Amino acid sequence: MNSVDAAELVLTHYGISVTCTPLAGERDLNFRCVSTSSTGDAEYIFKVQSITEKSLIVAQNQVLEFLHEHASNVDRRDFSLTEPKLVTSVNGESLIELPDHRLGRLLTWVPGTLWSDESTHNEKQLASLGKAVGLLDSALSKFPISDGFANHDFGWNVLQTANLLSHVDLVADENIREIVRRTLSECVDMILPKLSQMPSQVIHNDGNDNNVVMVADNVVSLIDFGDIIVAPRICGLAVAAAYGIEHENDPIFGILPLVSGYHQASPLQADELAVLFPLIKTRIATSIVMAAIQSAASPDNEYLLISQEKFTKLIQTLDAASNDLSHFRFRSACGYEGNPTSREVRHWIQSGIPRIADVVMPPLADTPKMWFDWSITSQGAPKTSDEITVAMRNAGAALAIGNFCENRNVYEGDNYEVASATRRTVHLGVDLFAPAGTSVYAALDGVVELFNDNFAPLDYGPVIVLRHETGNGIPFWTLYGHLSRPSLVPLYIGKPISAGDEIATMGEEFENVGWAPHTHFQLLTSLVDMGVDVYGVAPLNELPLWRSISPNPNIVLRLAEGTDSHAHLATSDLVAERKVVLSRALSLNFRDPIEIVRGSGAYLYDDSDRPFLDLVNNVAHVGHSHPRVVRAGQEQMALLNTNTRYINQHAIEFARALASTMPDPLNVVFYVNSGSEANDLALRLARAHTHARGMLVLDHAYHGHITSIIDISPYKFARRGGAGRPDHVRVVPTPDSYKGLHRGLDAGLKYAAELDAQLADMGMPLCAFISESIVSTAGQITLADGFLARAYASVRAAGGVCIADEVQIGMGRVGDHFWGFELHGVVPDIVTIGKPLGNGHPIAAVVTTPEIAQSFLNGMEYFNTFGGNPVSAAIGQAVLDVVVEQGLQANARTMGNYLMDNVRTMSQSLDVIGDVRGSGLFIGVELVTDLATQTPATQLTDDLIQFAKERGVFLSCDGPDNNVLKIKPPLVVEQSDIDLFLSVLSDGLTALR
């Protein structure tokens, strides 16, 4: 069949006029069809297959229809793939019969470029591929599998690997043939039994580089479902990984982003990761055998030879690679501890069960010591033998220590791959510096596993590795490097060693291949098939992995001062780590995240010490790292930190001081640790007092992350992922007089009437009404005039109490008053305080009336382990003192008015500024695309935040449409800081609108 024939068939059966171009394929005829009509889809793929494969084609169609239905029923953010869609014929059929015992299908063409169009791919693309396979597997896990579905003899089905062994002799190259035979045999004998214990599902099974469609850096589709099988999902990931490998020297490192990306879309289990490396090798071996089989049958089919040159090289590289190290790398990339036995080894050593001897100079605890800093930032540290000797003599030290996990600048030469992206610089042992000839002792009972003279420059020199076992027989090792050559003479493999036996002496510098006399002592939970060449220095970008393989040996040395330098990872590696060890429900600011390492006043500084004006973090109420607040915490922490079951003046004095800022009768204080806790306790107080549960809340409000508080936070329960409004909650429209339900001079009274209507509809006794005095997550909404006073009156008339959430806006931030509720001339029954109270330290409080506090005395003790501890109370008192004594409330009023006045002036020439609102330094600037329609400028707002970051200003946004700049800086901002913001805002809006 040629292109003209294909076009005629498409026109006849589908009524679509197209021009066709043939595409390569292994078993099918494929044509890319471009419509000559201006209506309908522009491009298609026409697939022609043998009628003998009808049952398999029907299965493929069922999968495609299922995926199309799945995509239409879930949020696009949960399934971002665009899979081909079946086109029905003029007779309503998705599968048509053709002459010569053939079947035809027409599918929509997925636009984009193929993975194979690019020779190399970056980490983002690899992660996107992994995510795509994971999303597809997650969707297909719900596909109902009928008996016999996609069940046929199929060489590409890993579960049928045994059938390939009889064809291995077709592989021409003898060396490749034996590697392939060994790989497939190991799969049959060791991997297939493990797969049989795993759940099976439909998998795509063909994520090769010609079946992956990309748009920019994102994989948007996996096409060609001709190889679908029912198997454990890890088999499909192995296929994609095999084709995704590009790094010839370190292929596994190159695909870690792919594995991590899959895990983030569809979390992998430990048993799946244990078989991934053998399955990758099996897929490559399978490809080599299948190519040999098919080439013998069709020697002219060039498609069959694609990737084979690459795979014959790759199978050799992977055959030489460590299965353990590859397994550990996959685990670490998915957030698991690299070596699954490392935890047991560490716990056994720390248990007190084994007898542990000092490695040098017993009793080591009493030996005079000093520490050397060889980190990359260290300058002038002694490194030569003479320098070290002088430094130790001057310090009166008999022993000098070089730390574990120290990122050093002393490793040079080919051994350390200095020109590689995985250059090794992080020390994995503890160095024990002492004169040559100093005795070295075995730390634990064991046997000699290995010994050698590693004589390459800056290597170990003479080295001994001892093998030990935990009580459960788990092996681990201790390594002693830089020894004297005579130390190796009496050794033999398997020689028994007892803890405390002298096993060596420290070598001279010439024996230690360039290092000053010392012993490198290392603890290892695996030798990862490296023997005496096991890394004593790790690449920084795989440090979490190597900390598992080679834990801190101080659990053996027991140096009270500690030995861990905690080498600092690069920002990109921290981002990767964060994705797998912290919940991805935690968001990050900015498209390209920034690592912040310190703060001072109104500024934050990144890892290159670049300053950023912080207009976002109202937590740092009196300025980042305020010296008075820091000092208060340090001094009290050095003295005492305990709980409130003991008398301590700090907690009592601070409670009195905090209550003195409140109007009567608010004078009873409860301490907690966060704003969420404060609001949860406020609910308990209200319920204890009213014996009711009904709640009134403002729309779009957020009051915290605790379950009870999510229930009264429409910002959470009414948005994506939320469970909807609970029965005991009624939502009042946000009293927004700019673009809300009611506007004008009487808007406040109309919103109060809305509250009355919700109250009447409640159908149960009212417990409380909770609100912020400026609604932050709604877009820094200043409540319409008169609303709050009228609302409080209605609530109290109904028997409820009024809760003022001051977590964000309290303690002088609103400028004209110390507390936000004072802006409205009301006095609440309960006040909750959070973010500003500790200037970054976790302290929060609830202040209420004696009457409500009395109602809480129901026989159940209130105790909060950390709430009101002396350190927190001392910090809180210092923050309050700074606010009052440095006039920060007045500064908030002055700077806030200056900022808002200037932005309002700016709005006269920049019509994207729809509204400027707030009080003091709690401000919202709403951006719109049209002043008349008030259409939210969501994209502009996001672009402006990125623009401002590049100009050294941190901004963020809020509101239902994410189009309101929220401005809530530390109260210490100065006019020059505001001027910087105004300049950036003007430039950004001018450039971006």
Short names for language-model regions:
Residues 442-487:
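Zn2+-dependent peptidoglycan hydrolase active-site motif and core
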Residues 166-167, 287-340, 939:
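ATP/Mg2+ or Mg2+-diphosphate-binding catalytic cores
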Residues 90, 118-175, 200, 693-722:
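A cross-family kinase active-site recognition segment
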Residues 2-11, 145, 161-205, 215:
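An alpha-helical support segment within catalytic cores of ATP-dependent transferases
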Residues 568-993:
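Conserved N-terminal phosphate-binding loop of PLP-dependent enzymes in the Aspartate aminotransferase
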Residues 346-376, 489-511, 517-568:
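Acidic, glycine-rich catalytic/binding loops that coordinate metals and/or anionic ligands
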Residues 234-267, 281-298:
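Active-site activation/catalytic loop segments of kinase-like enzymes and analogous catalytic loops
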Residues 48-100, 118, 123-127:
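A conserved alpha-helical element in kinase catalytic cores
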